[in-house]
Amino acid sequence: MSKKSQLVFAMVAGELSGDILGAGLMAALQKTHPNARFVGIGGPRMEALGFESLFAMEELAVMGIVEVLSRLPRLLHVRSSLIKSITELKPDCFIGIDAPDFNIGLELKLKAQGIKTVHYVSPSVWAWRPKRIFKIAKATNMVLSLLPFEKAFYDKHQVPCTFVGHTLADDIPLESDKASARQLLELDPDAEYLAILPGSRGGELKQLAEPFVKAALLIKQQFPDIRFVTPLVNQKRREQFEQALKAHAPDLEIHMVEGKSREVMAAADGILLASGTATLEAMLIKRPMVVAYRVSPLTYQIAKTMMQVNRFSLPNLLAGRDVVPELIQHDCTPEKIAAAVGVELNRDFAPIKAEFERLHQMLRCDASQKAAEAVLALVDAKDVN
């Protein structure tokens, strides 16, 4: 364990899920180094623990290849400013949390300046653009992976990697309490609810709010007594979703909640959601789900040429087989979504729940503590390439 009186960590988290991971890692590091300083880009959870943000996290919350291109000048400015600030700071370690297209380039520059670098959350190199592993090898001293199959990929390419498990698997109980979640959200204890999660980013809602709202109308025809509840990450996303609801289903009642996505999923009987980290959360909460996603046509065509896998959602990737339905791009239509939700709500969920329980146990490793131990071991290491 490092003997320095004050360790300094530079960190960059690119979105909500990164803020959660960053806060967990900070809390674990603060157990042994209560005076540690944390600087870079973080969200509200990290800032609540004393993180010093040089830029707002929203600057990095961009989805899709085409969408990134439109913001490229600003992103490059942010990165060059960070390189200057962090190089002057000379931290004991830089930790890039997810956001690989931004962070790996940053890590490459910082490592060249003699700063130890960690990338927390492996990019999906096993799924698409596998040659990125060579850049990752040059950019980082260590990768912290959340998923067990990722470490095998890094070991094969002789890139230092530690499997730490997933903080969500640590945080979410093995059996979630539907009744308590409904009480907290003031939902009817006896009604059937479908949770609708169209994503946390503006670009996601732009693509998904309309098909999700239209699908809800069709689902209401199949299940007249069903109710809908939607968590929105902030007021801006709520307004965006309300606009879609007003335009496409003005008479449909959807109960909206700011934040509390985990509680909303726990309160629900089924979940319709965007592909991403939320699918892992839904799996750990153990509810029937339908995963859907859509990006701009150009982004999709570019991504399709680089894909190495034919599954997208984390439950299916972890299981190594199709356990939840995925409706991607051209299949992300109101009709197909509604049909898939109908099937999931009517089927025997017991075998799928058993698989979710197995995967939950596999990922439950006290991730933040393991990540902190790996980072501190790197800080203490003398001979690091």
From Swiss-Prot:
Keywords assigned by UniProt, alphabetized: Glycosyltransferase, Lipid A biosynthesis, Lipid biosynthesis, Lipid metabolism, Transferase
GO terms classed as biological process: lipid A biosynthetic process
Top-level lineage group: Bacteria
Known catalytic reactions: a lipid X + a UDP-2-N,3-O-bis[(3R)-3-hydroxyacyl]-alpha-D-glucosamine = a lipid A disaccharide + UDP + H(+)
Pfam families noted in UniProt: LpxB
Pathway annotation from the record: Bacterial outer membrane biogenesis; LPS lipid A biosynthesis
CDD domains: Glycosyltransferase_GTB-type
Similarity field: Belongs to the LpxB family.
Entry function: Condensation of UDP-2,3-diacylglucosamine and 2,3-diacylglucosamine-1-phosphate to form lipid A disaccharide, a precursor of lipid A, a phosphorylated glycolipid that anchors the lipopolysaccharide to the outer membrane of the cell.
Protein's name in the database: Lipid-A-disaccharide synthase
Gene: lpxB
